């Protein structure tokens, strides 16, 4: 199983949904970076379950404990281990799923690959695996903010099912996004999104949608062609998040409908800085950041576990019917926002440290 991400700033997540706990080991973090448990906890609180009435009611404090690699609020340059205990797991709700496969979940494919799986709560396929990513993302953020104080990563829910928000990439703020439980910066769309999620939940169904993410203040020069282009590794990072099905940077698929003259971003000088008049490239050209805002869209499928009777099969190849039990998100989008941000920070931090190894910034 590949549970690691990054080359220089490298993370390895561990743990299962209903095991003793989950966490992450970070290797390659520079020394003397200010990091506290409070910094990590702030991000974990944004992704934890039970935070509102439109997410899973599972009650977990998700308290982060730094086990190694940090002393007196500063990183030591040695591996950083962060642990979070699982407390509110009810494995009995998954007894039937030990033999019967949930449609479109990872139950069957894990069995096909490993011949065994941690069936309670989905094991490693559970979104609780992302706790380690979010914790590590907080550390990556600290590394980058030390080098580039103005850099920021802001993600928000742009669409839930058929409800779309109207949000300006350039003006969106973290405070506006956190002002509502669905995490969008469009108040009118937020109300409609919340209503749609509740309606799906009450009927036992689920909804998907789109998260948008903008990176501001990224320096030019990050990215490692040809196989580790910045947009390629961002795609890798985002598509590794549970339930993701699509990724686009800049104009994305809309580029197919444009001419070269329409899509090209003309250059101009702003003092000593090279700028572009448009940003169809989404801040990345030739796989390398150009200093403009990096614009991303990530598509999420509806949650696979439904409280509706569905056709399936069991481990013995017999036809079966299955109705989900347990506690699940009817829509993962509100809690996916901090996960998307964390993966962006991790990707950018790794590329920054790679670049620092090659050339002084």
UniProtKB/Swiss-Prot annotation:
Query: Which reaction is recorded as catalysed by this protein?
Result: 5-O-(1-carboxyvinyl)-3-phosphoshikimate = chorismate + phosphate
Question: What cofactor requirement does the entry state?
Answer: FMNH2
PROSITE patterns, alphabetically? CHORISMATE_SYNTHASE_1, CHORISMATE_SYNTHASE_2
Gene Ontology CC terms, in alphabetical order = cytosol
Which free-text remark accompanies the cofactor? Answer: Reduced FMN (FMNH(2)).
Q: Which spans are transmembrane here?
A: none
- For this UniProt record, give its keywords in alphabetical order, as a comma-separated list: Amino-acid biosynthesis, Aromatic amino acid biosynthesis, FAD, Flavoprotein, FMN, Lyase, NADP
User: What molecular function terms (GO) are annotated for this protein?
Assistant: chorismate synthase activity; FMN binding
Record-annotated residues binding NADP(+)? Answer: 47
Which PANTHER family does the annotation name?
CHORISMATE SYNTHASE
Q: What does the similarity note say?
A: Belongs to the chorismate synthase family.
- Subunit structure of this chain's protein: Homotetramer.
Q: What is this protein called?
A: Chorismate synthase
Q: Which organism is it from?
A: Akkermansia muciniphila (strain ATCC BAA-835 / DSM 22959 / JCM 33894 / BCRC 81048 / CCUG 64013 / CIP 107961 / Muc)
Question: What gene codes for this chain?
Answer: aroC
């Amino acid at each position: 199983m590949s549970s690691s991400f990054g080359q220089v700033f490298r993370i390895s997540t561990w743990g299962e949904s209903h095991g003793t706990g989950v966490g992450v080991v970070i290797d390659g973090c520079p020394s003397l970076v200010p990091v506290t448990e409070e910094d990590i906890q702030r991000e974990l609180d944004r992704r934890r379950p039970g935070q509102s009435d439109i997410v899973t009611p599972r009650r977990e404090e998700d308290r982060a404990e730094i086990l190694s690699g940090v002393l007196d609020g500063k990183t030591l340059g040695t591996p950083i281990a962060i642990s979070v205990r699982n407390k509110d797991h009810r494995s009995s709700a998954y007894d039937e799923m030990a033999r019967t496969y949930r449609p479109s979940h990872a139950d069957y494919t894990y069995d096909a690959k490993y011949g065994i799986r941690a069936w309670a709560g989905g094991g490693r396929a559970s979104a609780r695996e992302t706790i380690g990513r979010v914790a590590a993302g907080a550390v990556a953020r600290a590394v980058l903010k030390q080098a580039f104080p103005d850099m920021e990563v802001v993600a928000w829910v742009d669409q839930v099912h058929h409800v779309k928000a109207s949000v300006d990439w350039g003006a969106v703020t973290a405070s506006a996004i956190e002002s509502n439980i669905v995490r969008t910066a469009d108040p009118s769309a937020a109300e409609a999104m919340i209503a749609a999620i509740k309606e799906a939940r009450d009927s036992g169904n689920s909804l998907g949608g789109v998260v948008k993410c903008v990176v501001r203040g990224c320096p030019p020069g990050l990215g490692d062609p040809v196989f580790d282009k910045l947009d390629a590794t961002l795609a890798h990072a985002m598509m590794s998040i549970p339930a993701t099905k699509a990724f686009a940077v800049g104009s994305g698929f809309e580029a197919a409908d444009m001419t070269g003259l329409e899509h090209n971003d003309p250059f101009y000088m702003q003092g000593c800085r090279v700028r572009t008049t448009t940003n169809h490239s989404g801040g990345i050209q030739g796989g390398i950041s150009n200093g403009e805002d990096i614009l991303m869209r990530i598509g999420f499928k509806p949650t696979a576990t439904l409280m509706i009777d569905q056709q399936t099969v069991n481990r013995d190849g017999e036809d079966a019917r299955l109705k989900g039990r347990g506690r699940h998100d009817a829509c993962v989008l509100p809690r996916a926002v901090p996960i998307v941000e964390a993966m962006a920070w991790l990707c950018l931090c790794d590329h920054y440290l790679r670049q620092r190894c090659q050339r002084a910034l």
